Swiss-Prot record:
Subunit-structure text: Component of the NuA4 histone acetyltransferase complex which contains the catalytic subunit KAT5/TIP60 and the subunits EP400, TRRAP/PAF400, BRD8/SMAP, EPC1, DMAP1/DNMAP1, RUVBL1/TIP49, RUVBL2, ING3, actin, ACTL6A/BAF53A, MORF4L1/MRG15, MORF4L2/MRGX, MRGBP, YEATS4/GAS41 and VPS72/YL1. The NuA4 complex interacts with MYC and the adenovirus E1A protein. MORF4L1 may also participate in the formation of NuA4 related complexes which lack the KAT5/TIP60 catalytic subunit, but which include the SWI/SNF related protein SRCAP.
Function in brief: Component of the NuA4 histone acetyltransferase complex which is involved in transcriptional activation of select genes principally by acetylation of nucleosomal histone H4 and H2A. This modification may both alter nucleosome - DNA interactions and promote interaction of the modified histones with other proteins which positively regulate transcription. This complex may be required for the activation of transcriptional programs associated with oncogene and proto-oncogene mediated growth induction, tumor suppressor mediated growth arrest and replicative senescence, apoptosis, and DNA repair.
Name of the protein in question: Mortality factor 4-like protein 2
UniProt feature, compositional bias: Polar residues: 1-15
Taxonomic classification: Eukaryota, Metazoa, Chordata, Craniata, Vertebrata
Phosphoserine carried by residues: 71
GO cellular component, one term: nucleus
Keywords: Chromatin regulator, DNA damage, DNA repair, Growth regulation, Nucleus, Phosphoprotein, Transcription, Transcription regulation
Keyword Phosphoprotein: yes
């Protein structure tokens, strides 16, 4: 004890800093234990918050605003460890090589485990509409007929009639808001996916002609019920990549299935083979 005091008096402020660095070692150990215990508790908060049964705008999901609990935990650990280095610890007490070997996790990159565990979203097509999907395929791919465009009743008109039908049933305000969001989301997905995922190969020259004739028009104002129905065969795979939590996704699927029931109920007026016409010989040459 005497040798420590004699060496500390000439240093002045440095002796005080060394003593302050040595004193909190026990408290630092307690803090690390508390940190390990608290990290498990704090993860439950965001998960419960994301499970609120509310349909997000444009199906975006509240979880998009909050990073996954794993990334939050890693960020907190990094933030708590950095002050320890700034307080003046020597390299012998806090070895650097292990820290250099630890790679920082990028919160924007999905882990392999999360990708494998991603839920599969299945949209159930009503039995009444399945025969029409088969007939639509047969008319285009085997009989080489084309759905006449612009459609007599386009996708926008179908969605608007559905929304008006639901609102006329006396729904409360929050359900009316949800219907508006569902309709807007269906329209948005349709316009994005049509050119890449909703067309048969034989229809692509027709699509190119439509783009030239209507360069500024959204495809939901040009195409009709058959292509809208094709959307629901593909949309499940797309919904698996949205940041929606499980309850919000289940709520959304309920609205989508309700819309499909509406299509099935009105299938006689929405789906008819008379809307198709045999393609010309010139078109066949373009489609080769």
């Amino acid at each position: 004890m005497s040798s420590r005091k004699q060496g500390s008096q000439p240093r002045g402020q440095q002796s005080a800093e060394e003593e302050n660095f040595k004193k909190p070692t026990r408290s630092n150990m307690q803090r690390s234990k508390m940190r390990g215990a608290s990290s498990g508790k704090k993860t439950a908060g965001p998960q419960q918050k994301n499970l609120e049964p509310a349909l997000p705008g444009r199906w975006g999901g509240r979880s998009a605003e909050n990073p996954p609990s794993g990334s939050v935990r890693k960020t907190r650990k990094n933030k708590q460890k950095t002050p320890g280095n700034e307080d003046g610890g020597s390299t012998s007490e806090a070895p650097q090589p292990p820290r250099k070997k630890r790679a920082r996790a990028d919160p924007t990159v999905e882990s392999e485990e999360a990708f494998k565990n991603r839920m599969e979203v299945k949209v159930k097509i009503p039995e009444e509409l399945k025969p029409w999907l088969v007939e639509d395929w047969d008319l285009v791919t085997r009989q080489k007929q084309l759905f006449q465009l612009p459609a007599k009743k386009n996708v926008d008109a179908i969605l608007e009639e559905y929304a008006n039908c639901k609102k006329s049933q006396g729904n409360v305000d929050n359900k009316e808001y949800a219907v508006n969001e569902v309709v807007a989301g269906i329209k948005e997905y349709f316009n994005v996916m049509l050119g890449t995922q909703l067309l048969y190969k034989f229809e692509r020259p027709q699509y190119a002609e439509i783009l030239l004739a209507h360069p500024d028009a959204p495809m939901s104002q040009v195409y009709g019920a058959p292509h809208l129905l094709r959307l629901f065969v593909r949309i499940g795979a797309m919904l698996a990549y949205t940041p929606l939590d499980e309850k919000s996704l289940a709520l959304l699927l309920g609205y989508l299935h309700d819309f499909l029931k509406y299509l099935a109920k009105n299938s006689a007026s929405l789906f008819t083979a008379s809307d198709y016409k045999v393609a010309s010989a010139e078109y066949h040459r373009k489609a080769l």
